[in-house]
Amino acid sequence: MKYIVVTGGVMSGLGKGITAASIGRLFVDMGYRVIPIKIDPYINIDAGTMNPFQHGEVYVLKDGTEVDLDLGHYERFIGEEVTGDHNITTGKIYKRVIEKERKGDYLGQTVQIIPHVTDEIKSWIRRVAKESNAEICLVEIGGTVGDIEGMPFLEAIRQMHNEEKEEDFALVHVTLVPLDAGGEQKTKPTQHSVKELRELGLHPDVIVGRCSERLKPATKKKIALFCDVPEEAVISNEDAEDIYEVPLIFKREKLDEYLMRKLNLRAKESRKEWEEMVKRMKTLYEEASIAIVGKYVDVRDAYLSIKEALKHGGIEAGCKVNIVWVDSEDLENVDDFTLDVDGILVPGGFGARGAEGKIRAIEYARENGVPFLGICFGFQLAVIEFARNVVGFSEANSTELDENTPHPVIDLLPEQKGIDEMGGTMRLGDIEVTIKPGTIAHKLYGSEKVVERHRHRYEVNPEYIEKIESKGLVFSAYSDGGRRMEIAELPDHPFFFATQFHPEFKSRPYRPSPPFVGFVRAALKYRREEEI
């Protein structure tokens, strides 16, 4: 097993996740199976209860584990579907150590950070790597070198480095190379970051410099001199127009060749699908504007997978997607409004704040023939809007938003009743969905059975299905033997489509999600017709 560990210095938010995912992509293109592990030093067990304003999107894995958004980058770049074991948190490690202590596994020892916590970290990494049957294990340590939360993990990595063969271990350190007022690239932050890393017993094999422009030869030479690495191990990672260009930047920098020599590997093949995908993406000449109507629009990472899935759909449809961010609360405070866009998307979410604004956006899309895609909460709100304005249940609602609504067209899942804990208790992960033949959904997917990821507590109330369908809204897919509605569509609308599941979590740049492809194609058609 070869281990590539990615750490970060100077500041958070430099793009360690994209760096790690891009390195993984390089090895995938050379014919290797790569498996990622993301270490998050926070004490939370998982990301499921975290506020999107603080943490961005909660990404859902196939086994239902709620994780950091970087796991989404890994799945999209590397092409592997992973499980909750591929996300290590301080909470998980401490929980495991405490459980062992309670069972007496430590035989009366004083349980300490070293060796018990560090041994648990190493054991977890090696177990996941072995069970994956991969050839390369990519480990990203979240946070910044020097953070107190990350110290046990860095110590565990130091020990692993000493325990593994030199040719089986590579450490990549991502740092910031800022520009001063005169435009000079400054290396001092990188020097200090590497110094701090070395004080912990770790020496980087590769230094990736994040900068607004390509690192100059003189900058690379200076970093190499003061940080004690070869010049060829100083890699430029300048700002790119799109994150999918980063693997190509690394290939230009010959990072793949350097790591192959360090790990004593040879390329098995030379795949071009990623490079070809980026070329297609950069040559799209038609455009369509799509509004994302949500309440977390000030934190764009809260809808990261949706942004990426729209991009994937655009590549397939031959169309560049321009996103227009609309705060749903703003739509609640106006008598009338116009959304000058080619498509409207209402994403997942929770709670009453902004919900009525989303319902108004859905009504606008339905009445004006604007292509619409609803996801999870957006699916539920689409059902509510239809029940109110077409079926005639003017006070229809979800019991999440109004416990006393006379028409609870959306209600709590039966198995959710009586659950008090929030973390990891929703209907989560991959679930098989059955699609009815002859529907828009069947045309998009081309199959009667699909597997999609879920994250919800509420569902369409079965008592209202027949009444709603009698007025024209078709529930075209279901799960759990027909008990749960999964897709709603309007056959006579240019494109009105909503899913209870989250199709964005399984969308890939070279294998886009069918609902997003259909949605973007409909938006492009709408734009063409508007221009005539």
UniProtKB/Swiss-Prot annotation:
| Gene Ontology MF terms | ATP binding; CTP synthase activity; glutaminase activity; identical protein binding; metal ion binding
Which pathway does this polypeptide act in? Pyrimidine metabolism; CTP biosynthesis via de novo pathway; CTP from UDP: step 2/2
Query: At which positions is L-glutamine bound?
Result: 349, 377-380, 400, 457
Q: Which residues bind Mg(2+)?
A: 70, 140
Is DNA damage found in the keyword set?
no
Q: Can you state the subunit structure given in the record?
A: Homotetramer.
Q: Which family does it belong to?
A: Belongs to the CTP synthase family.
Q: What is this protein called?
A: CTP synthase
Where does this protein come from, organism-wise? Answer: Archaeoglobus fulgidus (strain ATCC 49558 / DSM 4304 / JCM 9628 / NBRC 100126 / VC-16)
What are the top taxonomic ranks of the organism? Archaea, Methanobacteriati, Methanobacteriota, Archaeoglobi, Archaeoglobales
Gene behind the chain: pyrG
